[in-house]
Amino acid sequence: MSRLATRFEQLKSQQRKALVSYVMAGDPQPQVSVPLLHKMVEAGVDVIELGLPFSDPMADGPVIALAAERALAAGTNTLDALNMVKEFRQNDSETPVVLMGYLNPVEVIGYEKFVSHAKACGVDGVLLVDLPPEEAKEFDVVLKQHDMDQIFLLAPTSTDQRIEHVVKQASGFIYYVSLKGVTGAATLDVTEAAERIAKIKTKTSVPVGVGFGISDAASAKAMGQVADAVIVGSAFVKPFATLAIDQAVEQTVNKVKELRAALDELV
């Protein structure tokens, strides 16, 4: 059983919800990332999404886009991000790690080379934001050869046809985007999300996580009631835009604790 499947099974047996954290690799400095990931796991993160810095992150709001700029300015590239996972794995062989990024850098490296190296470093799955399921078959074949999961996005605007494509191909978990827009946007419609997630879950046993717009205990708890996982990015990344590194790490870890406590109230 994959690390993702194992983690979701464990949580399900405990009637707990997964807290999935997004961190941009190399933000604000490459040496910050691995210690930060360990601290976040210690504070209650169940699954890590590691962002691959890219110069044109079209699906991301200003917080994540600026994080990508900081990481790139610090010299972080895609292979550096994979090596961070390798370093993380020296002390953590259990927490699933999913890479989240864009297609272009992966195509430049080549599917086989990228996936085999990612697997060797200890990566469990990949979410390429701009690779729709209809065009993802070739990449999926390579991932499956290496026992890795391909994570797909679904949104309030997804057609029935897109939902069918995703539930057929997805493994690990499905990432439901709770807002029409970019990451870190402001307003959440819990009722609409609940209806859409319920519809998706009638078609698949793959866990469904919900993200975009979750930034505090109240929104985490609300979404935790309707999904298997709550995915948080901007709220963890934001402190690094303005604070000294130590302060930013502390604030991010405290945010993890706040959200973990909120989700555990649902047990």
UniProtKB/Swiss-Prot annotation:
Give the residues annotated as active site. 49 (proton acceptor), 60 (proton acceptor)
Its Enzyme Commission number(s) read 4.2.1.20
Q: Which UniProt keywords apply?
A: Amino-acid biosynthesis, Aromatic amino acid biosynthesis, Lyase, Tryptophan biosynthesis
Q: Tell me the superkingdom of the source.
A: Bacteria
- Enzyme class comes to lyase
Instruction: Name the PROSITE patterns for this protein.
Output: TRP_SYNTHASE_ALPHA
Entry GO CC: cytosol
The molecular function terms in GO held by this entry are: tryptophan synthase activity
Write down the Pfam families for this protein, in alphabetical order.
Trp_syntA
Tell me if RNA-binding is a UniProt keyword of this record.
no
Q: Which reaction does it catalyse?
A: (1S,2R)-1-C-(indol-3-yl)glycerol 3-phosphate + L-serine = D-glyceraldehyde 3-phosphate + L-tryptophan + H2O
Its pathway?
Answer: Amino-acid biosynthesis; L-tryptophan biosynthesis; L-tryptophan from chorismate: step 5/5
Under the heading NCBIfam families, the entry gives: trpA
Quaternary structure, from the entry: Tetramer of two alpha and two beta chains.
Q: Would you identify the family this protein belongs to, as annotated?
A: Belongs to the TrpA family.
Role noted for this protein: The alpha subunit is responsible for the aldol cleavage of indoleglycerol phosphate to indole and glyceraldehyde 3-phosphate.
What's this protein's name? Tryptophan synthase alpha chain
> Which organism does this sequence originate in?
Acinetobacter baylyi (strain ATCC 33305 / BD413 / ADP1)
